[in-house]
Amino acid sequence: MFAPLLRVLFGSKNDREVKRMRRAVRAINALEEQMVALTDEQLRAKTEEFRGRLGKGETLDQLLPEAFAVAREAGKRVMGMRHFDVQLIGGMVLHEGKIAEMRTGEGKTLVATLAVYLNALAGKGVHVVTVNDYLARRDANWMRPLYEFLGLSVGVVTPFQPPEEKRAAYAADITYGTNNEFGFDYLRDNMAFSLEDKFQRELNYAVIDEVDSILIDEARTPLIISGQAEDSSQLYLQINALIPRLKRHIEEEEGVVTQEGHYVVDEKTRQIELNEQGHQFIEELLASAGLLPEGDNLYSAHNLQLLTHVYAGLRAHVLFHRNVEYIVQGNQVLLIDEHTGRTMQGRRLSEGLHQAIEAKEGLPIQAESQTLASTTFQNYFRLYHKLAGMTGTADTEAFEFRQIYGLDVVVIPTHRPIARKDFNDLVYLTQEEKYAAIIGDIKECQTQGRPVLVGTASIESSEYVSQLLKKEGIAHQVLNAKYHEKEAEIIAQAGRPGAVTIATNMAGRGTDILLGGNWEVEVAALENPTDEPVAQIKADWQKRHQQVIEAGGLHVIASERHESRRIDNQLRGRAGRQGDPGSSRFYLSLEDNLMRIFASDRVKNFMKALGMQAGEAIEHRMVTNAIEKAQRKVEGRNFDMRKQLLEFDDVANEQRKVIYHMRNSLLESEDIGETIAEFRREVLGAAIGQHIPPQSLPEQWDVAGLEAVLQSDFGVQLPLQQWLDEDDRLHEEALRERILEALLVAYREKEEIAGTEALRTFEKQILLRVLDDLWKDHLLTMDHLRHGIHLRGYAQKNPKQEYKRESFELFQSLLESIKRDAIRVLSHVQVRREDPAEEEERLRREAEALARRMQFQHAAASALAPQAEEDDLEVVEEVPLPGTAPVRPEPKIGRNEPCPCGSGKKYKHCHGQLN
């Protein structure tokens, strides 16, 4: 009740933040004349001066006004661009580790230079993260002259880059790259066999462009490095032949069955489930195909792999549609990003789903893969000491940014007032009527000379609109995943008078649509541009620009609402950049997916009550509000899914950090002899304890069993029974010490033959290999645990707590296995003299061969989320998560302190065992 009044009196939190920063803007502006008076050399020398002051104890916050003033002056001299006051505010928001929401055309790329320059002064590296390689290269090349003028180095990381180039790019003061490449390089670094093979420094500061796309849209997509698993392509083909015989079971909300079938589809959660008739029928089909023994059960433990194939086939046929979720190009299935409409090169769905789609489309089936290393963007970006982001649309997701990443959103005022008109939605009864109205609107804009951008949700929709326009003889350009090579060129000219451009969702994001077209692109197309043709191109563009402004600017037409309001706002934001005129309108129908699945029956009943006729539309604020309510419902569901993914992956993330910390410690250690000796003592103690229980009588000892274990696990034959027969006083502890001494003697003999240095190198490489192999197997086991854990809910158990408990037990077992396997390999190895340098080179060649066989994937979101319906997710108590700040360096934990994992054990007996 009082909130609106208080907001009027004191302003919103956002207003107060902006007001606070305007004081700093005045301080920066006061320095402008002083900076103008400096020569280029004096301005460049400021960078070294700032670094010196940092070394003497000044902070980046204290340097900010002067550093921003220097960056602004350098921008004017090098690029002819002066940072506006609101852009200075944007730079401060980024420096403070927050998200700056800036409208389209407000110069986000230029804003980033302020915070990037200031934070690069510390010499710890700054990463600028973009959504694709084109934008990474474009922005780096665009801003490179500014940074180099100020004495800073710039690098770009790209896929398939030679190692030397990539290492140099990461060593630069400022590194541009995509979220995928930064994430994969982090995983690669944690598979390296020497420190020299690593690329990244400590993760210091990152500025994420289009932060909503990366931290929200991509959050449920794990990054996976995988190797090839066993080939089961024939099984995919056999299952694929059976799936079309299954029918969908359809039941209306009132419980009336309209079609008897074998499986049920939940369109809201994109889940598919075989019913009782389906289980019986598929078992009969599998038995007749010779894939399931007669009388056997599909749910038997030894048939679970077969069940996985059946569900993969079902999902491929029912939930994945060609030209909607994927396209076929050559002999490949390329996934389409639902948020951008772009193809996702190199990404493959996990759990056999990609292979099932290949079988469905009759394409060569690529081998399955096994996870070697994985993480999520949520956990990767929380490793940075400081994180910031920019986007045109973040405010609708402010709660999630705060909750998951500890990032506040600050809405930056526009340099010029927004002149765009956003019309109410027009809702039609059928899609046919809706598309007819869209064509009518396009025709009207063409007669006025206005450019039109038509946004569609899928390739299928964009091609349907294209066909309708062809019938009407209207010239147009289509921009979707099939034609993404032309993306920048098409978007650059989408603002010409009367131009019609059809784009899937946010294809072309990152490139502004300039009214009248882009004259710079025309100049770039000239072979030998001279002043005269360039001047003519500029003059022609000025006429077109004025013509489009007088006609009303760019008109954005959306053919349907997206599940997220943010994506709709991004589409609207293509019009009306930098105070230009423009307009937007959404055309909807009751047959659209969002309306059909999520919009309330109230809207449908309301429209029917009006007695609407064919071709008529309803335009009412109540309808628009009802649709936004449906979108908020979907956004809430998607947030819950992302939050749940994070809660499950946080368990794996703690284990990942322990393993990667151990790996790095191994790489940094010159001598791990003491670690190996400690492992040997522990492994031997466990082996003796199994055969000679503590405080037991000699009659209870299994001496023969212990002799066999010593030979199989430690590679030594010791006459234990003879020792005991010869010495009546040989008690348990003395026997243990005598066995250990015998093992040490045998190991020292190997050390004398191989040489101490060579053996230390060999120990390190063996331990790294054992760790990597067992970690890979552990990831697979964790996947299996995660996929079935939701079933514990039926036993009145909390799936999350069960997952934490069992994964901790698995991790304890992993730690023991690492020690045991490393000692077993080192005990059995046959030693011969070899140059340590040759050995290391051989191992490096093997690692490179492995890297060539690796696949870098974005798995389906379900690879990290448990397989569960929404009801299963609600077994646990709903408690809001506290905000999670970006990860800072953790304080050192004492060996006798309680382990932070919550096991109740001392740190040295738990996660500290391997440190």
From Swiss-Prot:
Catalytic activity: ATP + H2O + cellular proteinSide 1 = ADP + phosphate + cellular proteinSide 2
Keywords for the protein's UniProt record, in alphabetical order: ATP-binding, Cell inner membrane, Cell membrane, Cytoplasm, Membrane, Metal-binding, Nucleotide-binding, Protein transport, Translocase, Translocation, Transport, Zinc
Residue positions binding Zn(2+): 899, 901, 910-911
Xref: InterPro entries: Helicase_ATP-bd, Helicase_C-like, P-loop_NTPase, SEC_C_motif, SecA, SecA_CS, SecA_DEAD, SecA_motor_DEAD
Cofactors, names only: Zn(2+)
Pfam family, one: SecA_SW
Broad class of the protein's primary localization: membrane
EC number: 7.4.2.8
Annotated GO biological process: intracellular protein transmembrane transport; protein import; protein targeting; protein transport by the Sec complex
Gene Ontology CC: one annotated term: cell envelope Sec protein transport complex
Role: Part of the Sec protein translocase complex. Interacts with the SecYEG preprotein conducting channel. Has a central role in coupling the hydrolysis of ATP to the transfer of proteins into and across the cell membrane, serving both as a receptor for the preprotein-SecB complex and as an ATP-driven molecular motor driving the stepwise translocation of polypeptide chains across the membrane.
Complexes and interactors: Monomer and homodimer. Part of the essential Sec protein translocation apparatus which comprises SecA, SecYEG and auxiliary proteins SecDF-YajC and YidC.
NCBIfam families noted in UniProt: PRK12904.1, secA
Annotated protein name in UniProt: Protein translocase subunit SecA
Lineage summary: Bacteria, Pseudomonadati, Pseudomonadota, Gammaproteobacteria, Pseudomonadales
